[in-house]
Amino acid sequence: MSATDIYNAVQAAFDGDPGPAEPPPLEISGSGRGDSTIPVYADKLLNRSALRDLPDPESLIDNVLDHGTVALLYGKWGTGKSFIAQDIAASVATGRHWQGRDTRQRRVLYIAAEGAYGLKGRLHAWETGWHTPIRDGQLDVLPQPVNLTRPLDAANLGALIGWAGYGLVVIDTLARCMVGADENSAKDCGLIVDTLHRLRQQTPDGRGVILGVHHAGKDGKTFRGSTTFEAGADTVYSVAAEERVIILERQKRKDGPVVDRHELKLESIEGTSSCVIEVSQLTSETTVRAVTGPREVVHGERESFIGEYSWQ
């Protein structure tokens, strides 16, 4: 099946029969607005009043993730990108601040395409460390990949998102969910990005967030594969490890300031087999310490165990 065939099939699965691949020749009658035939896109038009009434952009996590967007988080293996994605997911699911930023509580779906067994220990450490339980129905885990190149799989995932009302969907990793696609093909990657946006449309009022976790290229700094991914996403963050510090930095934001840099670290949690993500240094560009309530401690009280865990 060609990339064009995949696109048409995905479109049909989401929206019904998309019609012919090529539009019929455009016929201009010369009658202008007096023509009784209503054009296909007429009901999609926004006049000035309708445009003025559109909701203002809002954040899922203040100055990090915006409602109604597709976001990408990428980094080299072992930089802690999955820990960050899981920290974001748990924070949104419970409504807890994420690294000091206000968070809107939403139901979360985490697609653990590489398996869910590691999540058990990590989420236990998160709950223990932040004294915040994740209750049933707040964060659901799908412990298998969903092949986004297969129209039926993509449509079934969209149906699940709409049925459950997930406001955040994390796909970890994209590579495991696009088997058969060529990461270096602009056409293939464009179709995957289009599918991510279609999945976002299935979230409540289309205002949820789809967060895809991906790998960095051979240089460890740039997004692996076609630049179509980054071009088609609304928000892009990179993750890098510098000695004992995890650097999370925004590379793209469709609306609003781009600059957002976090210096983070992994800290072990006593009584668990894993750790949590915390601020490493308090600088003008990083957020305030995320620890609040019963677990508020002096910065640096506990020993950091970066390097002793599998912290992809």
Regions from the PLM with identified roles:
Residues 72-73, 78, 82-83, 168, ...:
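Phosphate-binding/switch region of NTP-binding enzymes
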Residues 39, 49, 55, 60-61, ...:
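Conserved inter-motif catalytic segment of the P-loop NTP-binding fold
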Residues 65, 110, 172, 233, ...:
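Conserved RecA-like P-loop NTPase ATPase core
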